[in-house]
A protein has these predicted regions:
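Central helical "cap/lid" subdomain
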Residues: 41, 190-248, 258-264, 286
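Glycine-rich FAD pyrophosphate-binding loop
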Residues: 25-47
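Flavin-binding catalytic cores
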Residues: 259-263, 271-339
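Helix-loop-beta segment of a Rossmann-like dinucleotide-binding subdomain
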Residues: 83-93, 119-162, 179-180, 361-370
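N-terminal Rossmann-like FAD-binding beta1-loop-alpha1 element of flavoenzymes
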Residues: 6-32
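C-terminal catalytic lobe of FAD-dependent flavoproteins
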Residues: 306-307, 311-386
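Helical element adjacent to the flavin cofactor pocket in flavoenzyme catalytic cores
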Residues: 134-205, 376-384
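Dinucleotide-binding Rossmann-like beta1-alpha1 core, especially the glycine-rich loop
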Residues: 49-132
Length: 386
């Protein structure tokens, strides 16, 4: 058992956590990273479409599109080594059941100031399925290369401690600091805590108690729903190898390069989410079959869970093949599962804001919730040493 006092505690070792830790370390601050998994980047930073968002995904939320595009170049400059950009990224609008048609999508892109060049939908899609297709500029990142970079940079710092396989038991707010006690008895103390745990954000907040007011203290949780999601990795034909395709704006699909792995990710608005929970903390029937691995108060890693669902490959692949011309072939390689939190307030316009919430100033406790990789820079303002 040890007791360590540091300048900053970062909970969560995904991109937002490691970025924050390195940012603070470069300011000369001592940092402790607390991660529940055996290694960093085992959940949503790795298990997602790996899309470096330029904003095309949000035709009903111009503000989200502009924010994504604003950080796109900076992410490219900082992490170009992990970015795959030598493929054609094609967006198309479905002729039926789409919230947005081709003309509206083009106007949206023009308003957001992002590249959108019309191309022949007949090159990629079966006749009658899409009313427009566009060549865009949007890339994909390789999470494992990004992880290696952060671990290498953090490894050069003598003021950062990473604690993996760490289970937090209590978080106590004291007069001038927060005290975090782990299941193994270790205690970490700091006057600044960042909760960067994404789908576990509310679970971490629920662990906080206030020594001054007693256990009646309860921070306001994020109003989110939870989706248990599947990303399918595919091997592709030569015709599809250097192409990414996203069909908008409704119950459709995307198939695009998965970083620099040589595989494509296949997702579907309808079939990627296997189950949804509207509770404050993730409550799913599969938790009853997880043999204690996952609970509403302790979210397990869906990709490692013994109760993870069967693949929706049959449904996702059928949907994509209905739209795509036969030469753009693909076959199943493996499935990846993760939990995705979505703000309930964004369900109407499908916006994806980055929410940074400060629960206390002195000592400081901050939570961040964001579903986009390149908006990590929103954290800079709260991380800068005052």
């Amino acid at each position: 058992m040890s007791k360590v006092t540091v300048d900053r505690i970062i909970i969560g070792a995904g991109l937002y956590g490691l970025y924050s830790a390195l940012f603070c370390a470069k300011q000369g601050e001592s940092v402790a990273i607390i991660e529940c998994d055996p290694k960093p980047f085992m959940r949503a930073t790795y298990i997602n479409q790996a899309r470096v968002h330029m904003g095309y995904h949000y035709p009903r939320s111009l503000s989200t599109a502009i924010k994504s595009a604003g950080y796109y170049e900076r992410f490219h400059d900082d992490y170009g080594f992990c970015i795959h950009d030598t493929f054609d990224q094609i967006y198309a609008t479905s002729k039926q059941f789409s919230w947005t048609n081709a003309n509206e999508f083009k106007k949206f892109c023009d308003a957001a100031g992002i590249l959108c060049e019309q191309t022949d939908a007949g090159i990629y899609f079966n006749a009658g399925y899409c009313d427009g297709a566009f060549r865009t500029r949007e890339d994909t990142y390789d999470a494992m290369l990004l992880k290696e970079h952060f671990l290498r940079e953090i490894g050069h710092c003598n003021n950062v401690w990473m604690n993996c396989n760490a289970r937090i038991e209590t978080i106590t707010k004291k007069e001038d600091c927060y005290e975090i006690r782990l299941a193994n008895g270790d205690i970490y103390i700091s006057d600044f805590v960042l909760n960067a745990t994404y789908a576990s954000t509310n679970q971490i907040l629920s662990l906080i108690s206030d020594e001054m007011t007693g256990n009646t203290y309860r921070p306001q949780l994020f109003p989110i729903k939870y989706e248990l999601c599947e990303i399918i990795l595919c091997e592709t034909s030569n015709e599809l190898k250097n192409v990414g395709i996203t069909v908008m704006d409704g119950p459709f699909f995307s198939i695009m390069p998965f970083g620099k792995t040589g595989l494509h990710s296949l997702t579907s608005v309808t079939f990627t989410p296997h189950d949804t929970s509207y509770d404050e903390k993730p409550l799913f029937k599969c938790q009853e079959r997880s043999e204690g691995y996952c609970e509403s108060d302790r979210l397990g890693n869906c990709n490692e869970c013994p109760a993870k669902p069967e693949s929706a490959w049959q449904y996702m692949s059928s949907l994509a093949r209905k739209y795509l011309k036969e030469e753009f072939g693909f076959k199943y390689k493996e499935s990846l599962f993760s939990m995705k939190p979505i703000l309930k307030t964004t369900e109407v316009d499908d916006s994806r804001p980055t929410v940074i919430k400060t629960y206390s100033d002195t000592p400081t406790f901050v939570s961040v919730l964001s579903g986009k990789i390149n908006t990590v820079y929103d954290l800079d303002d709260i991380l800068i040493k005052r």
